[in-house]
Amino acid sequence: MNRAVATCCIFLLLSAFLCDQVMSKGGRGGARGSARGTARGGRTSRARGSPAVRVAGAAAAGAAVALGAGGWYASAQRRPDDSSERGDDYYSNRTNWELYLARTSGATVHDSTITRLSALLLPINYMMHFAP
């Protein structure tokens, strides 16, 4: 699975998890159309899952996509063992000091303005969403 597709699926499922139908309903509150019941001429409503069940399903699907993407990333990082002889490091996980030093020596900190801006706007968004 492509990393961009996995990220898109995660954001799609998170938006389904965070956006409830009540919050996204436009217009005035109250029942409209067939939700009024049969006494006013509406159709009988079909059985739907409760919001808690739908939210739990969306959360489970998001967790499954996240675990799948994590497993894909971990398998992509693994290197095949191409040595013909099996020495002392056959049962090791290749975390000797030289490998660690080679992987971390070129590491740089990426602190862009977008990261700082999102770190500032995310709590404000949460406060506006959950404010009474």
Swiss-Prot record:
Glycans are attached at N93. Prion-like protein that has PrP(C)-like neuroprotective activity. The gene is sprn. Residues 108-132 form a propeptide. The lineage of its organism: Eukaryota, Metazoa, Chordata, Craniata, Vertebrata. Belongs to the SPRN family. Keywords: Amyloid, Cell membrane, Glycoprotein, GPI-anchor, Lipoprotein, Membrane, Prion, Signal. The keyword Oxidoreductase does not apply. This is Shadow of prion protein. Mainly expressed in brain. Also expressed in embryo and retina. It comes from the Eukaryota. Residues 26-50 are annotated as: Disordered. Residues 33-50 have a biased composition (Low complexity). Residues 1-24 form the signal peptide. InterPro entries: Shadoo (IPR029238). One of its GO terms (cellular component) is side of membrane.
